[in-house]
Amino acid sequence: MRRVQTEEPTLAPAIAARLRRNDAGLVPAVVQDAATGDVLMMAWMDDVALARTLATRRATYWSRSRQEYWVKGETSGHTQHVCSVRLDCDGDTLLLRVDQVDGACHTGDHTCFDADVLLAEEVES
């Protein structure tokens, strides 16, 4: 059987030129639930992770601790189907709107921001 080789997707030069990366070549990606508007998590992307995400609509990130790419949900089943990707006005932050399957956080919580509320909304009496 002949194996088909697939080419690694590359980031369009026009998009790459607009990105403002940190010293490690990374851009923060804020991830939002497309259905609820909840902010789910923040992860890091480089050009390869962004290109893979744009090509597949599967959220792909760069792990700073493991020094490798990871596709959200590949091992947990808690996948993110990417509905849209936006670049902020300064070009230094991405916004991914996703259809999230189960919890987005590695703890199993719906979002990575469920656990520690530092300042809650005021309740009028």
UniProtKB/Swiss-Prot annotation:
It catalyses: 1-(5-phospho-beta-D-ribosyl)-5'-AMP + H2O = 1-(5-phospho-beta-D-ribosyl)-5-[(5-phospho-beta-D-ribosylamino)methylideneamino]imidazole-4-carboxamide. GO terms for cellular component: cytoplasm. GO terms for biological process: L-histidine biosynthetic process. It is an enzyme of class 3 (hydrolase). Zn(2+) binds at residues 89, 105, 112. Its cofactor is Mg(2+); Zn(2+). One of its GO terms (molecular function) is magnesium ion binding. It comes from the Bacteria. Pathway: Amino-acid biosynthesis; L-histidine biosynthesis; L-histidine from 5-phospho-alpha-D-ribose 1-diphosphate: step 3/9. Mg(2+) binds at residues 88, 90, 92. Signal peptide: none annotated. Its EC number is 3.5.4.19. Keywords: Amino-acid biosynthesis, Cytoplasm, Histidine biosynthesis, Hydrolase, Magnesium, Metal-binding, Zinc. Its main location: cytoplasm. Homodimer. PANTHER family: HISTIDINE BIOSYNTHESIS BIFUNCTIONAL PROTEIN, PHOSPHORIBOSYL-AMP CYCLOHYDROLASE. This is Phosphoribosyl-AMP cyclohydrolase. The gene is hisI.
